[in-house]
Amino acid sequence: MTIHLVVIDALNLIRRVHAAQPGEPDVKNTARVCCQALSKIIKFSEPSHIVAVFDHHGDDRGWRAKLLPHYKEGRKPMPPELQAGMEIIQDAFMDLGIDSLLSDGDEADDLVATLALKVASRHQQVTIISTDKGYCQLLSPTLRVRDYFQQRWLDSPFVEKEYGVKPEQLPDYWGLAGISSSKIPGIPGIGPKAALELLSLYPDLDTILQAEDLPTKWQKKITKHRESAEASKKVASLKTDLTLGFNLQDIRYLAPSS
């Protein structure tokens, strides 16, 4: 059979829907609106397999915070009523025929990336539903990223327009320029413009760090902050080698009987 796997970045969807509610937040209403969105996604994408991937709810901030202690520091925590109602939302997803997968200590991003790449590398179609541009580093002819809220594809032309680099260069770009919203520092004094210029001269961060002919204006900064650049690139890179404790058959999409 032809496979089309749709992977939902669950909290990316849920938190945006919940925050957009007028008046007092209501988890049941959040679940209802999310299910309306998912029904549209299913109709639009016609998946053969589908799964919603959730972050774990533990206190462990994960391997990225061990490399960069300030990683994602200061972000608003999940509203308590939303965290308490997560089971209600997951049950509503299941009623639509969408199983939920919890990351169990790994960031959901890495679990999404591992699953998506495993299927896409077998020349089967994968669509990730998320506004997170970090997934764009995975783009390939068989792997797409869809921003549901903006109704647009985060594809190669989007990446080139937004950043000026190829999708596979994004971790190198972020290793240089950083990501301020995630407290990923990159190299102080190297902003988007300089990062783009460097990646037009050299193919990746490793080559930049080893180059003996670096333009003088950047030499000192890059030499001084080499470790920050390497850690930033690693944190911005998605892991794609996690162990998956299930197979595709477990997430096959079966439309619920009306």
From Swiss-Prot:
<dbReference type="GO" id="GO:0008409">
    <property type="term" value="F:5'-3' exonuclease activity"/>
</dbReference>
<dbReference type="InterPro" id="IPR038969">
    <property type="entry name" value="FEN"/>
</dbReference>
<keyword id="KW-0255">Endonuclease</keyword>
<comment type="function">
    <text>Has flap endonuclease activity. During DNA replication, flap endonucleases cleave the 5'-overhanging flap structure that is generated by displacement synthesis when DNA polymerase encounters the 5'-end of a downstream Okazaki fragment.</text>
</comment>
<dbReference type="InterPro" id="IPR029060">
    <property type="entry name" value="PIN-like_dom_sf"/>
</dbReference>
<dbReference type="GO" id="GO:0030955">
    <property type="term" value="F:potassium ion binding"/>
</dbReference>
<keyword id="KW-0479">Metal-binding</keyword>
<feature type="domain" description="5'-3' exonuclease">
    <location>
        <begin position="165"/>
        <end position="254"/>
    </location>
</feature>
<feature type="binding site">
    <location>
        <position position="190"/>
    </location>
    <ligand>
        <name>K(+)</name>
    </ligand>
</feature>
<dbReference type="Pfam" id="PF01367">
    <property type="entry name" value="5_3_exonuc"/>
</dbReference>
<dbReference type="GO" id="GO:0033567">
    <property type="term" value="P:DNA replication, Okazaki fragment processing"/>
</dbReference>
<protein>
    <recommendedName>
        <fullName>Flap endonuclease Xni</fullName>
        <ecNumber>3.1.-.-</ecNumber>
    </recommendedName>
</protein>
<dbReference type="InterPro" id="IPR020046">
    <property type="entry name" value="5-3_exonucl_a-hlix_arch_N"/>
</dbReference>
<dbReference type="InterPro" id="IPR036279">
    <property type="entry name" value="5-3_exonuclease_C_sf"/>
</dbReference>
<keyword id="KW-0540">Nuclease</keyword>
<dbReference type="Pfam" id="PF02739">
    <property type="entry name" value="5_3_exonuc_N"/>
</dbReference>
<dbReference type="InterPro" id="IPR020045">
    <property type="entry name" value="DNA_polI_H3TH"/>
</dbReference>
<keyword id="KW-0238">DNA-binding</keyword>
<dbReference type="GO" id="GO:0003677">
    <property type="term" value="F:DNA binding"/>
</dbReference>
<feature type="region of interest" description="Interaction with DNA">
    <location>
        <begin position="189"/>
        <end position="194"/>
    </location>
</feature>
<dbReference type="InterPro" id="IPR002421">
    <property type="entry name" value="5-3_exonuclease"/>
</dbReference>
<dbReference type="InterPro" id="IPR022895">
    <property type="entry name" value="Xni"/>
</dbReference>
<feature type="binding site">
    <location>
        <position position="176"/>
    </location>
    <ligand>
        <name>K(+)</name>
    </ligand>
</feature>
<keyword id="KW-0378">Hydrolase</keyword>
<keyword id="KW-0630">Potassium</keyword>
<feature type="binding site">
    <location>
        <position position="185"/>
    </location>
    <ligand>
        <name>K(+)</name>
    </ligand>
</feature>
<comment type="similarity">
    <text>Belongs to the Xni family.</text>
</comment>
<feature type="binding site">
    <location>
        <position position="187"/>
    </location>
    <ligand>
        <name>K(+)</name>
    </ligand>
</feature>
<dbReference type="GO" id="GO:0000287">
    <property type="term" value="F:magnesium ion binding"/>
</dbReference>
<dbReference type="InterPro" id="IPR008918">
    <property type="entry name" value="HhH2"/>
</dbReference>
<feature type="binding site">
    <location>
        <position position="177"/>
    </location>
    <ligand>
        <name>K(+)</name>
    </ligand>
</feature>
<keyword id="KW-0460">Magnesium</keyword>
<feature type="binding site">
    <location>
        <position position="109"/>
    </location>
    <ligand>
        <name>Mg(2+)</name>
    </ligand>
</feature>
<dbReference type="GO" id="GO:0017108">
    <property type="term" value="F:5'-flap endonuclease activity"/>
</dbReference>
